[in-house]
């Protein structure tokens, strides 16, 4: 979202959604967005500064608008805890913006931040998989997931989706 090619990527998203016409859209973005911006005057804008947050919110709204017009059920997945403390703090701040924008746009926000933390709330590459066995869930970079981690991540999204589908059946 924070790349210099944002508008190009949004046109590609619009084109893709026009072709596919999905009923459900699941979105997870953010790790690559932890970069400073350049203001129109060329100065660096620090990550998580008020100006950065405002621009991040604007770009999220633009992306969400593209998805919203398709009348699909949208599940926006927040960032998990990250290994480096500064990265984890930035991820939490970004999740605040994502959650706010998702709620304002009528999307379901899926919070997974603490689901990949240890009992003390700190990053751990290990945790229970879907069977309860403790396994490596995160890659060596402290950001990405292993296969078991991806399955656990998908489980949290599936849980929200199933709950909404069951509620829709009941209504």
How would you describe each model-predicted region?
Residues 39-44, 78-79, 134-138:
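A short small-residue
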Residues 28-34, 38, 61-96, 113:
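Active-site segments of SGNH/GDSL-like serine hydrolases
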Residues 8, 12, 24, 48-51, ...:
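Extracytoplasmic/secreted proteins, especially bacterial periplasmic and envelope-associated proteins
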Residues 1-4, 15, 45-54, 64, ...:
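Second-shell loop/turn segments in exported
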């Amino acid at each position: 979202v924070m790349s210099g090619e944002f508008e190009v990527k949004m046109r590609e998203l619009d084109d893709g959604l026009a072709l596919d016409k999905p009923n459900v859209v699941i979105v997870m973005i953010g790790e690559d967005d932890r970069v400073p911006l350049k203001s129109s005057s060329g100065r660096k804008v620090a990550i998580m500064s008020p100006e950065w947050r405002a621009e991040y919110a604007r770009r999220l709204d633009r992306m969400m608008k593209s998805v919203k017009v398709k009348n699909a059920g949208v599940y926006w997945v927040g960032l998990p805890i990250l290994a480096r403390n500064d990265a984890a703090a930035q991820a939490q701040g970004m999740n605040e913006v994502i959650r706010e924008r998702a709620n304002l746009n009528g999307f379901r926000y899926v919070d997974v931040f603490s689901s990949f933390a240890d009992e003390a709330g700190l990053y751990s590459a290990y945790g229970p998989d879907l069977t309860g066995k403790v396994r490596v869930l995160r890659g060596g970079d402290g950001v990405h997931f292993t296969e078991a981690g991806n399955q656990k991540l998908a489980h949290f999204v599936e849980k929200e989706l199933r709950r909404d589908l069951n509620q829709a059946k009941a209504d």
